[in-house]
């Protein structure tokens, strides 16, 4: 009996010691550790087992700061949309390890910049790409989006109506009006006016989802917002274009809607159906789709830059850069602060996501529509917008990814003034 008591006492002591070690590395568990490690002195074997240490699951102490900032635990169901896979991933880290699309997305700004330099330096590199190639190229980009979607993902929109509505209104109301005001304020030449306004009326850019990921924003919201704005662009973009620039240049809204239907809705729907009913096909094509999307983006950017090189490098072309830069900076700022209004007051990740989705639009679609319906010179603003949008958007996302906010930008450049105010 004494041996049993001694063994039980030894086992209890070792168990308590183990619990003490497990909780020592976690400061938030000190009170529980003291409670478990210091039971009252037992008088019998039954009393020794009176307060058996509770086994704590290892996941209780697991923390993932990098995942928590992005909001993966709350949006685990849509996390796989970051990749070109056919189904959900077990963890974001494993998705990043086996998914080439994220690495290619990180290289996209460099590819865009290299495309611009090549098109302006040696126009023959892209001048062979005629407007007949634009629709297939953009269709390849849209197909790469469609295979990332599933029918269940759109059900999330009904569960999150407020942030989705804010982002959608900023995309199709605030941004087009802002584009018209900026174009008129800078006295934009008529050769670029209609194309610039059209660029402000298209759907969100696919790159905004990656920018939301870098900025530790709401990735699921970004993908839903981009998908909804892309699908509805079949109707909304022709209507906005006719209202805002119909008095400047003639716009065939019905023909534009048919073109968007062919190059946007059909490829996206095809990809959605493949991902839903033919996952084996998606598993075959998904490794090459990131490369296809990047190649198509490069063609859609380089062609209008190469064809209109003389106009871009002219005095009028240089005057075009300032309005485009102003527009994108204003769109990022307005998209952020409109989400901070007292009656809308959204969380920081949502504000960042709406900001990048407002400041980044599908300029490749605008370039296609401008080339088909407005003339090749009107595609120049869209091509320039792609370059500026990618550089500014991913720079801002990287800044936010370091844990900083827009309101902290001033203190980064004027640290002494910030220190004086804080003291």
UniProtKB/Swiss-Prot annotation:
Report membrane topology.
Multi-pass membrane protein
User: Which positions, given as ranges, span the membrane?
Assistant: 106-126, 138-158, 165-187, 192-214, 231-251, 254-274, 287-307, 318-338, 380-400
Q: Which domain of life is it from?
A: Eukaryota
Q: Which Gene3D superfamilies match?
A: 1.20.1530.20
Where would you say this protein principally sits, based on its record? membrane
Transit peptide, from-to = 1-45
Where does it localize?
Answer: Membrane; Plastid, Chloroplast envelope
User: Matching InterPro entries, A to Z?
Assistant: BilAc:Na_symport/Acr3, Bilac:Na_transpt, Na+/solute_symporter_sf
Per the record, GO CC terms? chloroplast envelope; membrane
Keywords, sorted A to Z? Chloroplast, Membrane, Plastid, Transit peptide, Transmembrane, Transmembrane helix, Transport
Cysteine pairs forming cystine bridges in this chain are none
Similarity comment: Belongs to the bile acid:sodium symporter (BASS) (TC 2.A.28) family.
PANTHER family from the UniProt entry: SODIUM-BILE ACID COTRANSPORTER (PTHR10361), SODIUM_METABOLITE COTRANSPORTER BASS3, CHLOROPLASTIC-RELATED (PTHR10361:SF33)
Q: What does this protein do?
A: May function as sodium-coupled metabolite transporter across the chloroplast envelope.
Its protein name is Probable sodium/metabolite cotransporter BASS3, chloroplastic
